[in-house]
Design a protein with these regions (language model features):
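Short cysteine-rich clusters marking metal-coordination/redox-active sites
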Residues: 34-37
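S-adenosyl-L-methionine/SAH cofactor-binding core of RNA-modifying enzymes
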Residues: 82-149, 153
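Short Cys/His-rich local motifs and their 1-3 flanking residues in nucleic-acid-associated proteins
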Residues: 39-42, 46
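C-terminal folded domains that constitute the principal catalytic or ligand-binding module
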Residues: 137, 145-227
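Short metal-coordination and nucleic-acid-contact micro-motifs, chiefly zinc-binding Cys/His arrays
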Residues: 30, 40, 54
Length: 227
């Protein structure tokens, strides 16, 4: 068991807990969890967390409740990849640090989302192009599918950002929450697919392996399937 790593997602979690007037009671709230990996203490996987290097960066726009959920997989990205940013999504009160990041000329931002939802004037890409030496910044909406569609639609500050539409036949292996669609990938699966697309195969496979290890450890401590 270890203290939680100091990264953007865990800082959002700490801030949300500090602001809350009552505890956030997720499923399994009675379980004594490792603060580092959010798995039950006796099944801690912190020692198995890989430190990865990649040619791309990630930016998670998170629904307000996501950092508080022990089943959140966006945290796994930040656990492994140090150049990961995270912000709580807001439609009107946008974090100025996020806006500065979107305009940072060191990065080429993309919103990772199905192309059919793009605005008519919005560029849709199926490949990652680090043009003019700019580092790809992949923005992932970390929420349920219903929430993510709303977030995408109601984020005018993303309207000029190219959409990266993943073309994958991969089915989700996420087993900690129920979904009506097997082709809806969870956040960390999207990140792994992006790493593959960028040619970072080793990082993609290591991140996917850590995700599978997290899922197996989490489920091994559950008394029943998630509802």
């Amino acid at each position: 068991m270890s203290e939680h790593p100091d990264h953007a997602v865990n800082r959002l979690r700490s801030d949300a807990i500090a602001r809350s007037t009552r505890p956030f009671l997720a499923r399994g709230a009675r379980v004594r969890r490792c603060p580092g990996c959010q798995v039950a203490e006796h099944a801690c996987i912190c020692a198995e967390r890989p430190a990865l290097d990649s040619g791309v960066s990630f930016c998670l726009l998170m629904h307000a409740y996501e950092p508080l959920k022990p089943t959140n997989t966006g945290r796994l990205i930040a656990d492994c990849l140090p150049d990961t940013y995270a912000f709580t999504w807001a439609r009107t009160e946008v974090d100025p640090v996020l806006l500065a990041l979107l305009n940072d000329l060191r990065y080429q931002p993309y919103v990772v989302f199905p192309g059919e939802y793009a605005q008519p004037t919005q560029q849709v890409c199926e490949q990652i192009d680090a043009g003019q030496g700019r580092r790809p910044l992949l923005i992932i909406l970390d929420a349920t599918w219903t929430q993510a569609r709303k977030m995408f639609r109601k984020s005018p500050y993303l309207a000029d950002v190219p959409v990266l539409s993943l073309q994958t036949e991969q089915l989700s292996r996420y087993r900690l929450r129920r979904s009506t669609r097997d082709d809806h990938l969870c956040t960390v699966e999207v990140a792994s697919a992006c790493l593959q697309l960028a040619g970072d195969t080793a990082a993609a496979e290591a991140l996917d392996g850590y995700f599978q290890r997290f899922t197996d450890a989490y489920l091994s401590t559950c008394r029943k399937r998630p509802q």
